[in-house]
From Swiss-Prot:
SUPFAM superfamilies, alphabetized: PRC-barrel domain, Translation proteins
Quaternary organization: Binds ribosomal protein uS19.
InterPro entries: PRC_barrel-like_sf, PRC_RimM, RimM, RimM_N, RimM_N_sf, Transl_B-barrel_sf
Gene transcribed to yield this protein: rimM
Compartments (UniProt record): Cytoplasm
The organism's place on the tree of life at top rank: Bacteria
An annotated GO cellular component: cytoplasm
GO biological processes: ribosomal small subunit biogenesis; rRNA processing
GO molecular function: ribosome binding
Record has rRNA processing as a keyword: yes
Protein name as it appears in the record: Ribosome maturation factor RimM
Amino acid sequence: MNKNCVEVGKITQARGLKGCVVARIEPILESFDPINYIFIKIGHTLVPYQVEEITGQAQQVFIKFQHISDRDSVRELIGSSIWLSQEILDKLVVQEEPYIDIIGYQVTDKYQGELGIIKDIEQFPLHVCLVVDYLDKELLIPYEPALIQDLDHEQKKIIVELPMGFLEAMGCK
């Protein structure tokens, strides 16, 4: 496997009759230009596929490959992971916000109440997490727009809506 590649998504289904696929993409990509090819993991090998067109936005995109023109040919790719070279990924990654400004903010869950103070920000390859002191444990909360309900810089508070069972899954309850 190529160590200079990063997994960025997964093919979830075929679309239409002309060899197009639907893919879920990590929310790190701002655009898809200029992608001429992607790698698809087949077995233990990354196989390059030439891209004719990528459309869509956010985390769901439609990919049309060159030289594939029927639904049956793409069915075997369903469930396969999508990889990009680090060089291409570096050109496409969304520019990071200055997260350092929110260290010290109080994090409150919409349903669970106060969780704690942000003591650090952890940057992982595909996302950013808030590090919060919660019941003498370190709680990692993904810094995702879908979870953030309100960000009040004046009062230094962040209101989040964590999924049901999140705290239990993190070993905090």
